[in-house]
């Protein structure tokens, strides 16, 4: 017995209707402009161009035209780049985008505006992100986390601030229980203490890339020297903020190149040939950057960084 369902939707349908969606924070250097990704919810039958105005703190500028060079067709949410100019003064402004026309005719949608916060600054700071990774020597899947952290350091340089938190077991010679982020499995990581946890190998690269596209409102420059007794580090920090606000500073001292000769320093490895926990059936089926683990054995001596 067959079953068929027919759905018929009736009603007035505006062919030229767009709702812009709020676009968050943007930073523009004084005297310049920047293209900003804005999402447009198309409620009409086609979408090939818009006319719009941009208002700063309620004062609208001249109407502008943007041709997309193609028709997006019926419905859908589409992301386009719209140029936003800096304010004439340094500081924070409320910016409002109003889509006045769609395909050359008046925008028929009831909601025509979207808002964001514009930071007009003297110069744009380099965005850096902190990646805190939960790991451990007795974690057989953690070698891929080490690889991911290494890859991101090579890709982004000092824009990537990696911290390897050995918290899985107190038998780990690098065990750190001075603060707890609540990792539910290992390896796992958190970026800028926001957006929850993610897998360092499968998910972290994309989340990190997105975080580095966010605006930086402050810059911290750090310098450190060993004290005479070599058991303490004297550190100084300089902070430059582009906008006024209340800020807290947290710091951590990390080390690279840690090694040991006892068995507790050995890194467990489930990606080796023949291990029952290895999700890969052959070396050639593994991603190229972790193929070396196939031949490492079930545990191996590692050099640990960012600890």
Residues of each region from the PLM?
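Short, surface-exposed loop/turn segments at beta-strand-coil junctions that are enriched for proline
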Residues: 85-91
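A short beta-turn/strand-edge loop motif at beta-sheet boundaries
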Residues: 29, 42-49, 240-247
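Local sequence-structure signature of Cys/Sec-based thiol-disulfide redox active-site neighborhoods
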Residues: 121-160
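Short, conserved sequence motifs used for protein processing/export or organelle targeting and
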Residues: 65-67, 158-307
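Short, solvent-exposed loop/linker segments at the N-terminal edge
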Residues: 25-33, 224-230
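Short strand-edge motifs at loop-to-beta-strand transitions and within beta-strands
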Residues: 76-82, 288
